């Protein structure tokens, strides 16, 4: 692993982020693995371009836990894609599910995703946020790697490379990457896009709240019927 020159300490996030902006994604990962808190983990939706972060992290930390929140409503293609990448990259996959099944949730609350923004928020809390929070706590994650990028939506344009949430640090090594950067990395390393990419799906979540991109649509409008882009994981954890 590359040994990097001294950077500002973690308690000076503003200055640290300025320095990290000058480093490559690979060196940002190396820095975090050397200097951020113990018990790192990577979360992945196994979405359209997820192979990039999975490949990047496992180059330097082959056994890093990879957290997948299985909401119970993922596309069949997503489950198969997760199997494919897990086998190819020898991932240390940790699958977390909601405390109650989708059938149970529907029996109690109906189809929450059809109940406007309040229903969508409640669904996301039960099926996404709670399992992710539980995963981070059970795995005692001190450093949480994500594949967030500023260009993905208007809600992510100000995302920093390093953020602090209580005692946990969230690291987004490719936050400044463009779609072109993603494509070049995937081409160079012969990595696959999600199978639904070729059908126009650019952001892939649950079956009932994901749409393919259509003319005059923003990428963020393909999720949650255009009500919102974020599922709550990166807003609330």
UniProtKB/Swiss-Prot annotation:
Pfam short name (any one): PAPS_reduct
Pathway: Sulfur metabolism; hydrogen sulfide biosynthesis; sulfite from sulfate: step 3/3
Swiss-Prot/TrEMBL keywords: Cytoplasm, Oxidoreductase
SUPFAM superfamilies: Adenine nucleotide alpha hydrolases-like
GO biological process terms on file: hydrogen sulfide biosynthetic process; sulfate assimilation, phosphoadenylyl sulfate reduction by phosphoadenylyl-sulfate reductase (thioredoxin)
Class of enzymatic activity (EC top level): oxidoreductase
Protein family (similarity comment): Belongs to the PAPS reductase family. CysH subfamily.
Compartments, record wording: Cytoplasm
Name the UniProt record assigns to this protein: Phosphoadenosine 5'-phosphosulfate reductase
One GO CC term, this protein: cytoplasm
Enzyme Commission number: 1.8.4.8
Principal subcellular localisation of the protein: cytoplasm
Disulfide bonds: none
Xref: Gene3D superfamilies: HUPs
Active site per database record: 231
Molecular-function annotations in GO: phosphoadenylyl-sulfate reductase (thioredoxin) activity
Gene: cysH
Function: Catalyzes the formation of sulfite from phosphoadenosine 5'-phosphosulfate (PAPS) using thioredoxin as an electron donor.
Catalytic activity annotation: [thioredoxin]-disulfide + sulfite + adenosine 3',5'-bisphosphate + 2 H(+) = [thioredoxin]-dithiol + 3'-phosphoadenylyl sulfate
């Amino acid at each position: 692993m590359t040994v990097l020159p001294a950077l500002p300490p973690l308690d000076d996030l503003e200055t640290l982020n300025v320095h990290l902006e000058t480093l490559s994604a690979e060196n940002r990962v190396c820095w975090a693995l050397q200097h951020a808190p113990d018990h790192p983990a990577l979360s992945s939706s196994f979405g359209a371009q997820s192979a990039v972060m999975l490949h990047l992290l496992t180059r330097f930390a082959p056994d890093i836990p990879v957290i997948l929140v299985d909401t119970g409503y993922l596309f069949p293609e997503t489950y198969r894609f997760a199997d494919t990448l897990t086998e190819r990259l020898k991932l240390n996959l940790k699958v977390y599910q909601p405390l109650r099944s989708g059938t149970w949730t529907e029996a109690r609350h109906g189809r929450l995703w059809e109940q406007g923004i309040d229903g969508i928020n409640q669904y996301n809390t039960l099926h996404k946020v709670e399992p992710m929070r539980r995963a981070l706590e059970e795995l005692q994650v001190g450093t949480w790697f994500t594949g967030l990028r500023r260009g993905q939506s208007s809600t992510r344009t100000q995302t920093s490379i390093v953020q602090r949430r209580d005692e946990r640090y969230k690291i987004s090594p490719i936050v400044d990457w463009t779609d072109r950067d993603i494509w070049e990395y995937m081409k160079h390393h012969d990595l696959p896009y999600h199978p639904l990419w070729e059908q126009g799906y650019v952001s892939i979540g649950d079956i009932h709240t994901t749409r393919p991109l259509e003319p005059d649509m923003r990428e963020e409008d393909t999720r949650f019927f255009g009500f919102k882009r974020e599922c709550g994981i990166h807003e609330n954890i």
